[in-house]
Amino acid sequence: MQVSVEATQGLERRLTISVPAEQIEKLVKDSLQREAKRARIPGFRPGKVPVTVINKRYGAAIRQDITGEVMQRNFIEAIIAEKLNPAGAPTFVPGATDGEKFEFVATFEIYPEVELKGLDAIEVEQPKASVTDADVDSMIETLRKQHATFAAVEREAADGDKVKMNFVGSVDGVEFEGGKADDFELQLGSGRMIPGFEAGILGHKAGEEFVIDVTFPEEYHAENLKGKAAKFAITLTEVLAANLPEVNDEFAALFGISEGGLDALKTEIRKNMNRELEQALKANVKEQVITGLLANNDIELPKALIDGEVNVLRQQAMQRFGGQTANMPELPAELFTEQAARRVKIGLLLGEVIKTNELKAEDERVQALIASMASAYEDPSEVVAYYNSNKELMQNMRNVALEEQAVEALLKSAKVTEKEVAFEEFMNKATGRA
């Protein structure tokens, strides 16, 4: 086998590989003979079909298969010999056979050489937060509101009330599509409607008819309404006030607490809040570390890896539409290219961190991650057992553990400052509610 390597552009490499033509001819001959022994063709006894007949019927397909196998095998031998690390599947272009040699070209991309830089320039503001008694009480108040019952009242509508109404919206005196509803129910203070709509209902009673003026946000989804001033003619049909359940053992029973009553509920709430806080704190620090790592390391990315990641993201997006992807048009790659490139770059950089620091997934950390995740389920032990019996899930958890270890390794050289933050403020920002 003779091999020449050409760097074409960027990460692309072109291998020209020559192998003795007799190598292919022998493999084709052997394959034809094997096929002749097992072929069943009318007019010939089993195992007695002439090779010339087999060659006429199947020769072209057999030669094509053999050629593909020869190219694949010799390509692998060539990249090992040349110490090349392909980042995607090669494209093979077979050449002509001159009787003595068979030549083909393999084109592919290689992984970039990654040299980590600026690790000591990464700046991280590490938030410190804890769950207080007041935070637990606030969560209980939220749960009370979620389990409230509503009854009609004869007073002005206030924040937290539910109201029922009929309304018609118009812009410049003309009704617009989607701007009309009957028997519409809305909880005031929920933020479901455009700014000013809910505020315009406050202070009105059931039976009143009134008009409110609002302006659609510039980022509103309907193009024809962006930034437009509108009027809504409203007929308020009912005002319903919330009746919150008392905080007692009966309230605790609503959440499956069969023993321990209210104290047991508070313990369970605190445990869940602590778990969510720990996850959010880790995610916050990780995002800062990753952002710093990306900013300080500019590397060339193999297009093959980006294309593969685009396909993954596209498939995930299609599944979010309900999994019915058969009759849906394919989403354009441009929607996912930027995110895909970022994910590829993160993977390459973290891979180098793992390699440089000789990191291996710690079994204790893997089991701790599984236990933390399982604690959110009714029967944690069953979830833990399921994960430990599933090779694919276990590999996913090892990857998560390795990522954590890589982030911790980067933190050792980063500029880290700690900042005390309140639980509610931090979690609101983490979940996008701030």
UniProtKB/Swiss-Prot annotation:
Principal subcellular localisation of the protein: cytoplasm
Residues making up the signal peptide according to the UniProt record: none
Domain PPIase FKBP-type: 160-245
Protein location: Cytoplasm
UniProt xrefs under Gene3D superfamilies: 3.10.50.40, Trigger factor ribosome-binding domain, Trigger factor, C-terminal domain
Keywords: Cell cycle, Cell division, Chaperone, Cytoplasm, Isomerase, Rotamase
Enzyme Commission designation: 5.2.1.8
GO cellular component, one term: cytoplasm
MF terms in GO: peptidyl-prolyl cis-trans isomerase activity; protein folding chaperone; ribosome binding
Catalysed transformations (reactions): [protein]-peptidylproline (omega=180) = [protein]-peptidylproline (omega=0)
Xref: Pfam families: FKBP_C, Trigger_C, Trigger_N
Family classification: Belongs to the FKBP-type PPIase family. Tig subfamily.
Cross-referenced NCBIfam families: tig
Domains (record comment): Consists of 3 domains; the N-terminus binds the ribosome, the middle domain has PPIase activity, while the C-terminus has intrinsic chaperone activity on its own.
Cited function: Involved in protein export. Acts as a chaperone by maintaining the newly synthesized protein in an open conformation. Functions as a peptidyl-prolyl cis-trans isomerase.
Record protein name field: Trigger factor
Organism: Shewanella sp. (strain ANA-3)
